[in-house]
């Protein structure tokens, strides 16, 4: 998976991209003037995550396949706990836990194992109204889901 941002991201959005890349053990790349197809062609396994900006903060996350087709779009707001400060995370394998349609979609697209959250791990707790990113038993941040849209595949 490759993570990038909108073309002119705010500092908050760039920080969120770095945190997501560190959490998922993948690469973050600044987009600059590159088009979506140019970025997609650089993806190793074909999954691209684009973090969009809204009024100076991360406002959306979109997932694209290897052909640049949108798979999932999530509109969100971000909550950081008191004392939040970005630090790189250890390269532990993340797991996902939760319930609901969004959990199933993320589990499928991100291709990370489903499992319990332990005190010495990275875990994404997913439901249809929020995504909590947990590291070493502490919440890093929470994405409050405003709405999401999945791509409907034609038969």
Curated annotation (Swiss-Prot):
Source domain of life: Archaea
Any one GO molecular function term: rRNA binding
SUPFAM superfamilies given in the database record: Class II aaRS ABD-related
GO biological process: rRNA processing
Keywords carried by this UniProt record: Ribosome biogenesis
Keyword check for Metal-binding: no
HAMAP family: BriX
NCBIfam families given in the database record: PRK00933.1-3 (NF002093)
Protein name as it appears in the record: Probable Brix domain-containing ribosomal biogenesis protein
